[in-house]
Amino acid sequence: LEDLAGGSVGVQAGSSAQVAIDDTPGFKDSLKEIVEFKENLTALMDLEIGGVDAVVMDLLVANDNINRSGKDFRILDQTLTEEEYAIGFRKNDIALRDAVDAELLAMAEDGTLAQIAEKWFGADITIVGK
């Protein structure tokens, strides 16, 4: 991320990526400019023609957009923030919650979860059991 200091970064307006930039003042202040785009695809097109030096977006969105475009973009190993997602159950559905938890752990242990993630997201982005 330090290599982006003094550069211009694109971001989808109103996205969680924009919030991540705003919540990381050291990074935000190091940039020459932040260019807002209506959508990530437009930001990536601007990156391709050199309008911005980088684009900040959610990892899943980045993997999907890059894989579909076939462009030679690189995703940095460093992140600005981490987001957590959860599965919601009704309060009295304890048995269902426990069954889903057990199955997710089993799938993580046997590698099924990683295979699914690779297929649909282009990378093993799983956190279950880690």
Question: For each of these PLM feature ranges, what is it?
Answer:
Residues L4, L47-E48, I87, V100:
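Hydrophobic residues within well-ordered alpha-helices
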Residues V9-A17, K91-D93:
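Short coil/turn segments
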Residues A17-E36, I66-G70:
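Ligand-binding cleft/hinge of the Venus flytrap
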Residues A43-D46, V52, A62:
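Short, hydrophobic alpha-helical packing/hinge segments within bilobed ligand-binding/sensory domains
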Residues L1-S8:
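Flexible hinge/capping segments at coil-to-helix
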Residues I34-M45, E83:
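Short helix-initiation/N-cap motifs at beta->coil->alpha
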Residues A17, L59-W120, A123-K130:
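Periplasmic-binding protein-like
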